Amino acid sequence: MAITKEDILEAVGSLTVMELNDLVKAFEEKFGVSAAAVAVAGPAGAGAADAEEKTEFDVVLASAGDQKVGVIKVVRAITGLGLKEAKDIVDGAPKTIKEGVSKAEAEDIQKQLEEAGAKVEIK
């Protein structure tokens, strides 16, 4: 009969702290791994954020302007959405069109939308 995960969890749950410590050490020796916590960088301070150049941008449709139909067409082309979804985005401005894009792509999207008559922000 094979041991199930539930059996292992039940056995580990009944161990004392000292027994768990010994178990962790045995895992480290047997498999050549370390149970040390991985250091995670905290949030950068305001000064560090300014010094580091932003690499990902969000393109936000601020308003559709007078040429809504043209803006809807461009939004559909950029996002690949259907007509109704693109219209809902344009009607619900301000809305994010694309997230996490490169600066060049964000500027290209901004140019396309502005040529169609929209007002666009890059964040």
UniProtKB/Swiss-Prot annotation:
Source organism superkingdom: Bacteria
Organism of provenance: Neisseria meningitidis serogroup B / serotype 15 (strain H44/76)
Quaternary state and interactors: Homodimer. Part of the ribosomal stalk of the 50S ribosomal subunit. Forms a multimeric L10(L12)X complex, where L10 forms an elongated spine to which 2 to 4 L12 dimers bind in a sequential fashion. Binds GTP-bound translation factors.
Disulfide bonds: none
PANTHER family: 39S RIBOSOMAL PROTEIN L12 (PTHR45987), LARGE RIBOSOMAL SUBUNIT PROTEIN BL12M (PTHR45987:SF4)
Protein's UniProt name: Large ribosomal subunit protein bL12
Gene: rplL
Family affiliation: Belongs to the bacterial ribosomal protein bL12 family.
GO CC, alphabetical: cytosolic large ribosomal subunit
GO terms under biological process: translation
GO molecular function: mRNA binding; structural constituent of ribosome
Record flagged with keyword Ribonucleoprotein: yes
Function: Forms part of the ribosomal stalk which helps the ribosome interact with GTP-bound translation factors. Is thus essential for accurate translation.
Keywords assigned by UniProt, alphabetized: Ribonucleoprotein, Ribosomal protein
